[in-house]
């Protein structure tokens, strides 16, 4: 689990310039230095550890966490750590209605599967060069926007977001669907729209990587607990099974006595 040293080394305490802030973040600010707000890391570590446990427990219950972060500093880490914990992700562009109009999104994912099937069975080669080119372009476009959620068969149970200001549409959709939002909140963010906030820098690459890494670790820890629980569970014995085993034993005994 994250330590104070981790937070300091990754620059989690550096907020935005003092002229770019949300007054609702006042309670998370330690002070100001050279025109930059400094985030109170004592609060950060407390919120971080609490949220880690929330995410771990959600994963232990088999819940799905959607990773969202489309800006340059976040895209690579979002994909890397979502894949490490087997969760869906959006790291290219958030399409409006990705959750509130999920049925349409699933239709687009199906189109991607159709194009891939045409490539696999060779039927794409029966088209004109222009048709094949247009299909392949469409495939690349669909992969970029939907590749990270192509295996997401239903809406996620929770959303982990990097930069709630940039990803305001994703957060608004999650809020509308009453889907819990987990997110680092920088000094320019609105903490009221996040269910499980972690005060911290959401711009620096190392800080973003730390948040993604910790969420992935929490999920993998939760999955391990779930696997352990399932392994320990013994299937309950029905009366019918008891009667069947008794009858079988009696039948074997009768056979041996003959």
UniProtKB/Swiss-Prot annotation:
GO terms for biological process: translation. PROSITE patterns: RIBOSOMAL_S2_1, RIBOSOMAL_S2_2. Residues 222-258 are annotated as: Disordered. Keywords: Ribonucleoprotein, Ribosomal protein. One of its GO terms (cellular component) is cytosolic small ribosomal subunit. The keyword Cell inner membrane does not apply. One of its GO terms (molecular function) is structural constituent of ribosome. It holds the Pfam family Ribosomal_S2. Belongs to the universal ribosomal protein uS2 family. NCBIfam families: rpsB_bact. This is Small ribosomal subunit protein uS2. It comes from Campylobacter fetus subsp. fetus (strain 82-40).
